[in-house]
From Swiss-Prot:
Homodimer. It comes from Chlamydia muridarum (strain MoPn / Nigg). This is Isoprenyl transferase. Its cofactor is Mg(2+). Keywords: Magnesium, Metal-binding, Transferase. One of its GO terms (biological process) is polyprenol biosynthetic process. Belongs to the UPP synthase family. Its EC number is 2.5.1.-.
Length: 253
């Protein structure tokens, strides 16, 4: 069990388990490089030490979300724009993803969590594509919670890919122009079948959404914290959820 929930008093725990509990939480895990710079005296040997420390933060966040009954948790791991970073950093990040897939698979099995990856996965190294496919296949029968990693993801890229596929289906007369609706477009997105996020958390304090789930977050509640991702704990997640529960969602009405 998450240490944060173990330490929560009964009133706090009951409050967190009461509605409205977000069914789908999305997190922009920002601040890894700033954390590394802040701790550079300990991080000189590795260009992605901050990202490695950030990866260590993930299990307790997943545990806490699952224990609370969150149905889906989406983590923004690598954007389409991140390819503009140095080849060395990008290669090390992909190596980190590979190692995490291997080391955390038993974690997912133990908790019966289904893994899903979204983004333009075809642009990833073949080894990483293969490992993602294996991990997704190995957990596809689980239903406790769905953990979604956005890798080489950009919302504009997602929409372009979706519209190309939709156009192809129109051309092949699989669908008609009159069938096009918000629901149909959503079914062509990487997140097809998932509820739109109820809560979007951004760590690191930046006030922007960074080309993340732009279609899906039309009515999502936003929560920004100055805490850098490697320092983000289950307590910080609970604070975000408490803030969400105190808001009145109107869906644009």
């Amino acid at each position: 069990m998450s240490l944060a929930l173990e330490q929560a008093n009964p009133i706090q725990e009951n409050f967190l388990r009461e509605p409205p509990l977000p069914k789908h939480i999305a997190i922009i895990m920002d601040g890894n490089r700033r954390w590394q710079k802040k701790h550079e005296q300990f991080c000189k040997s590795n260009a992605i030490s901050g990202h490695r420390r950030g990866a260590d933060s993930i299990p307790q966040i997943v545990d806490t979300a699952a224990l609370l009954g969150v149905e889906a948790l989406t983590l923004f791991a690598f954007s389409t724009e991140n390819f503009s970073r140095s080849k060395t950093e990008v290669a090390e990040l992909f190596s980190l993803f590979n190692s995490q897939l291997h080391s955390k698979l038993s974690f997912l099995h133990d908790r019966e969590i289904r893994l899903r990856c979204i983004g333009d996965l075809s642009k990833l190294p073949q080894e990483l594509q293969n490992n993602i496919a294996k991990a997704v296949s190995a957990t596809t029968h689980y239903s406790h919670m769905e953990l979604i990693f956005a890798i080489n993801y950009g919302s504009k890229n997602e929409l372009v890919r979706a519209f190309k596929e939709l156009h192809q289906d129109l051309t092949n007369k699989k669908i008609s122009i009159n069938e096009i609706s918000e629901e149909l477009i959503s079914s062509y997105l990487d997140t097809s079948g998932l509820p739109d996020p109820d809560l979007l958390i951004r760590t690191g304090g930046e006030m922007r959404v960074s080309n993340f789930l732009l279609w899906q977050i039309a009515y999502t509640e936003l929560y920004v914290t100055d805490v850098l991702w490697p320092d983000f704990t289950a307590h910080d997640l609970l604070e975000a959820i408490k803030t969400y529960q105190q808001r009145s969602r109107r869906g644009g009405k």
